[in-house]
From Swiss-Prot:
GO biological process: translation
Molecular functions per Gene Ontology: structural constituent of ribosome
Family per record: Belongs to the bacterial ribosomal protein bL28 family.
Name this protein carries in UniProt: Large ribosomal subunit protein bL28
Keywords (A to Z) from UniProt: Ribonucleoprotein, Ribosomal protein
Species of origin: Mycoplasmopsis synoviae (strain 53)
InterPro entries: Bacterial_rp_bL28, Ribosomal_bL28, Ribosomal_bL28/bL31-like_sf, Ribosomal_bL28_bact-type, Ribosomal_bL28_sf
One Gene Ontology CC term in the entry: ribosome
Amino acid sequence: MSRVDWFRGVGPMSGNTRSHAMNASRRKFNVNLQKVRVDFGSGKRTLRISTKTLKTWRKKGLI
């Protein structure tokens, strides 16, 4: 299962991790995905959405 937000399509990003000596080594920043059951008109579905999307939907009253 891919680590992609169902709504925004945002996936993992790449960057560097830095040691105390400022040596850089590549790493991957994964999206914080959560499984949420959402009620559509045709029925309920389980979606994998990011916590940023979840926060926005809760603020707008969609969940």
